[in-house]
Amino acid sequence: MTASSSEAPKAHLGVTPPINTDMPAEHDAAASEALVHTLRELGVYESDAGKAVRTGVLDRLRAIADAWCENEWALAIAERACDGADCERALAASAPPRCELRTFGSVRLDVHTPDADIDVVLVAPRHCTRRAFFDTLVAALEGDAHIGAGGVMAVRDAYTPVVKLRVGATDVDLLFAPLACDELPEPLDVMDDAVLEGLDEAAIRSLNGARVAEMLLSLVPDPAVFRVALRAVKRWARCKGLYSNVLGLLGGVNCAILAAFVCQRYPNAAPSTVVGRFFRIFDGWDWPNPVLIAAPGAPPSSAGDESVASRYAAWNPRLNPRDRAHLAPIVTPAHPTMNSSYNVGAPQLRAIKDELSKGLETTRRVEKLAAHWRADESPTGDRAADLRDAWRRLFAPSDFFARHRHYVQVDVSAADDAGLRKWNAWCESRLRNLVVALDTPGYVRARPH
């Protein structure tokens, strides 16, 4: 046995081994610099002032949540105590349990645009109930001078219950996950499956946003490369009319998982290479084969299997006929695993594949230009300008309104702003079904935008 053959294989992130582990060449660095320059030119990065505003919003919400959690704890103590003296002694005997605000989505991944909203989940001990969250915490939010009653909309009956609010000029989606414990662990590891113990499905779904974000960052070889590539993928999807999870197209989580998958396959690649390989891989992807960045949880092997993850339904097309019907599975890494693109229909998938094919042509042009880069070339020279122009083509607006002859437009109206927000959200959630219903083979090829 040779020395090289006796070496243990290097561990890799993800389910499948890397395609290429080569380090970036000089022309890759030049193409990546041109990509970042183009993204900055398009305004996808937030300014320091914008970041300060966002931090202030989170600090304000954290202060309100801390006060609410402490007040709920005092009420719980009062309910258990027999009289006022007992209550005062109980309150003095221990410090109030803490709660935590955890950002997720684009803000946690640090790929948000200046106008992005903040996705955040409030994680609290068991004395903070969902009923109190929608009653007393919502009242506290409405009473805050920076928010006000008109800036808060509670959606209790949503698939994932949420409070939508506006703090100043910043929109926030606030979820709630009460854990089955008297005090939060210190530190709180949301990636530990044990945190799911005793939670109902609404709490699991609320917490999974934070779990997925943390796992995404832990499953990519280089988070900095991942962030640039993801910014590029999201901008491309927006420009081509593909960025809308509610329409059954690509949402933020979908894009993040796809970008992470490519990073795993090319662990040492530069951002420009990852973006190019993104189009190469997914233009030729054999759907409905799933995109996985972590091994899916195994189903219970027996009735005695008591692992936390096994007690919650995870995406599994072998066991679940509904999962088997999904057209383009992009599976979340955190247990219980879910198909983040469950709502993709035939017309949506056709639109995505069409734009992937066009994106592949554009990124191949970038690669050809970069291949002729010389080490002594100036980053402000003609070839660098050509690279930036090539990237701009990738982010050019869609020709959707010049390509088609017939369009369906849905107008939504209501008596007031609050009613319009609710009615518009309901109508939006049904539009993907309208697109699928309109799509008639041989007669109508519906194209959502």
Task: Please provide the spans of the model-predicted regions.
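N-terminal regions immediately upstream of nucleotidyltransferase
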Residues: M1-D115, H127-T136, G143, I147, ...
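Acidic, Ser/Thr-rich intrinsically disordered and amphipathic helical segments
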Residues: A30-A34, A52, G56, R60-A63, ...
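Conserved NTP/Mg2+-binding pocket subregion across the NTase superfamily
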Residues: D144, G150-V152, D157-S244, P321, ...
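Residues in well-ordered beta-strands of folded domains
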Residues: R102, V121, K164-R166, D173-L175, ...
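Acidic Asp/Glu-based divalent-cation binding sites
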Residues: D115-V121
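Conserved aromatic-histidine-acidic binding/catalytic patches
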Residues: A49, P125, P221, V246-L250
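Eukaryotic basic, amphipathic alpha-helical target segments in cytosolic regions
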Residues: G43-E46, R62-A76, V111, R126-C128, ...
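Pol beta-like nucleotidyltransferase catalytic core
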Residues: P9-V36, R231, G241, G248-G251, ...
